[in-house]
């Protein structure tokens, strides 16, 4: 399918519509809409998809206008035919024509008119045999014949119009069905499918790569795993196939979930946000079905990224005394779907890939088999001095700062703070001026404060007070555990 063909069909549809050949115009309009729907599925760029959707809506609106014109014209034809019948059937000046009231009574039903039209044909032949001897009756027979035939033609046109309308309605239903790609869950419970479809992030999380400070290595790896295979599918084949699993390891508050949101925003793939509650059920055997259904839906909506937050709660180490039989079956199904016969790695087409993106704060509790399937295991550390400074600038870009605020000095005093801790410090410091302003005021006085009174710049003293109130949440011993694990099992 080429864009030139779509353009030519649009031109033909508009030309036929301008010339008054509305039936042919509708055929071309319907074909153009179908071609554009098929072409939309091949467009990966979101901006281009929005442009094509706008064009589709404009063409669809033109087709609706043509359809309205057709229905209006048919309405005129159907409304005019009975009026002509009454005018010609009972002429006021012709005294020899019987003014029978029967045809007037039969007007609502179309059946008797067909029978009368046959009789009129017989009368016509009879009048032709007699020639001019029956002169006064000849015009009335002709008029009657014409009058009787016109409703038949109108009914035939009405029938064909209704058939065409039904076919167009069916085709419009088909177009609306092809607009939204819907998973066929034959063999699965409808509630299970709806539960997983709710975890598809269709709305934009609005987190960009630039909104995440530092973590350049992690960004580079995620782009290589998700973005580049979409841009260069001919390169990522065979031994260079895309990574099927990425595990992000690090202390809490370092930006693992933010990286996943950036993947959902930037990478233009279907994004499943899965937690342990999504894949658990109180009914026996349904948790394994959910895992299998998840990967089948992921392959259907491919390219897909499945983000499993806190994966240690779903796939912890097997064989322990605390393990339950149900959780063991769920882990086995997850491992099979990721790297089993017919699993997610069977498809060699990079545009149909299914990648599992996982995050955990307890990597030492993850099962060994899952660790092997998550081929890339990267460490998301605490922000460096440069990262802390960059994170401060991102958090404070909407605040009015006093002249004495030194961001470099604040970043140096935050050594050992995680990204979430730095955000909490900035939030607390931004509230200091408001706290000083409303101190000692009554609730009525606080309500009467103007907006200008509340917008006061944040000073260096506010940051110093916030640093005293907000302590770091990650200990040095925890950092040593993460570094030791990543040194032993890391795969950057």
From Swiss-Prot:
ATP binds at residues 250-257. ATPase activity is stimulated by microtubules, which promote homooligomerization. ATP-dependent microtubule severing is stimulated by interaction with katnb1. Residues 138-147 have a biased composition (Polar residues). The keyword Ion transport does not apply. Residues 91-158 are annotated as: Disordered. It is found in: Cytoplasm; Cytoplasm, Cytoskeleton, Microtubule organizing center, Centrosome; Cytoplasm, Cytoskeleton, Spindle pole; Cytoplasm, Cytoskeleton, Spindle. InterPro entries: AAA+_ATPase, AAA_lid_3, ATPase_AAA_core, ATPase_AAA_CS, KATNA1, KATNA1_MIT, KTNA1_AAA_dom, MT-severing_AAA_ATPase. One of its GO terms (molecular function) is microtubule binding. It is an enzyme of class 5 (isomerase). Keywords: ATP-binding, Cell cycle, Cell division, Cytoplasm, Cytoskeleton, Isomerase, Microtubule, Mitosis, Nucleotide-binding. Its EC number is 5.6.1.1. One of its GO terms (cellular component) is spindle pole. Catalytic subunit of a complex which severs microtubules in an ATP-dependent manner. Microtubule severing may promote rapid reorganization of cellular microtubule arrays and the release of microtubules from the centrosome following nucleation. Can homooligomerize into hexameric rings, which may be promoted by interaction with microtubules. Interacts with katnb1, which may serve as a targeting subunit. This is Katanin p60 ATPase-containing subunit A1. The gene is katna1.
């Amino acid at each position: 399918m080429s864009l030139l063909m779509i353009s030519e069909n649009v031109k033909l549809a508009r030309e036929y519509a301008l010339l008054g050949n509305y039936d042919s115009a509708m055929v071309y309009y319907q074909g153009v809409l179908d071609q554009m729907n098929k072409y939309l599925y091949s467009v990966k760029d979101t901006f281009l998809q929005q442009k094509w959707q706008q064009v589709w809506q404009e063409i669809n609106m033109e087709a609706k206008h043509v359809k309205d014109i057709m229905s209006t014209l048919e309405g005129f034809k159907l409304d005019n035919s009975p009026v002509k019948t009454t005018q010609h059937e009972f002429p006021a000046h012709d005294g020899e024509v019987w003014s029978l009231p029967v045809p007037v009574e039969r007007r609502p039903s179309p059946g008797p008119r067909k029978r009368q039209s046959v009789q009129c044909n017989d009368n016509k032949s009879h009048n032709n045999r007699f020639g001019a001897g029956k002169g006064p009756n000849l015009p009335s027979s002709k008029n009657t014949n014409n009058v009787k035939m016109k409703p038949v033609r109108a009914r035939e046109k009405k029938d064909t119009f209704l058939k065409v309308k039904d076919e167009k309605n069916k085709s419009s239903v088909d177009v609306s069905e092809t607009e939204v790609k819907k998973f066929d869950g034959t063999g699965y419970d409808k509630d299970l499918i709806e539960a997983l479809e709710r975890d598809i992030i269709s709305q934009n999380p609005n987190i960009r790569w630039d909104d995440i400070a530092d973590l350049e290595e992690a960004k580079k790896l995620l782009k290589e795993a998700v973005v580049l295979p979409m841009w260069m599918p001919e390169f990522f084949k065979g031994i260079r196939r895309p990574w099927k699993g990425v595990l992000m390891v690090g202390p809490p508050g370092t930006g693992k979930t933010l990286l996943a949101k950036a993947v959902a925003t930037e990478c233009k793939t279907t994004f499943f946000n899965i937690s342990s509650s999504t894949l658990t059920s109180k009914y026996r055997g349904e948790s394994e079905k959910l895992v299998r259904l998840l990967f089948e839906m992921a392959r259907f909506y491919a390219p897909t990224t499945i983000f499993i937050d806190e994966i240690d709660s779903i796939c912890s180490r097997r064989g322990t005394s605390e393990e339950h039989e149900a959780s063991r079956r769920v882990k086995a199904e997850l491992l099979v779907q990721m790297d089993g016969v017919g699993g997610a790695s069977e498809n060699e087409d990079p545009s149909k890939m299914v990648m599992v993106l996982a995050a955990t704060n307890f990597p030492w509790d993850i099962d060994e088999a899952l660790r092997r399937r998550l081929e890339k295991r990267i460490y998301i550390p605490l922000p460096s001095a440069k990262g802390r400074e960059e994170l401060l600038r991102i958090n404070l870009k909407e605040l009015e700062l006093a002249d004495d605020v030194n961001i470099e000095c604040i970043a140096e005093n935050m050594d050992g703070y995680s990204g979430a801790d730095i955000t909490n410090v900035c939030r607390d410091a931004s509230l200091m001026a408001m706290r000083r302003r409303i101190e000692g005021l009554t609730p009525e006085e606080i309500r009467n404060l103007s907006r200008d009174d509340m917008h006061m710049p944040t000073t260096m003293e506010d940051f110093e007070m916030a640093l005293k109130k907000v302590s770091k949440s990650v200990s040095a011993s925890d950092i040593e555990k993460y570094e030791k694990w990543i040194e032993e099992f890391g795969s950057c």
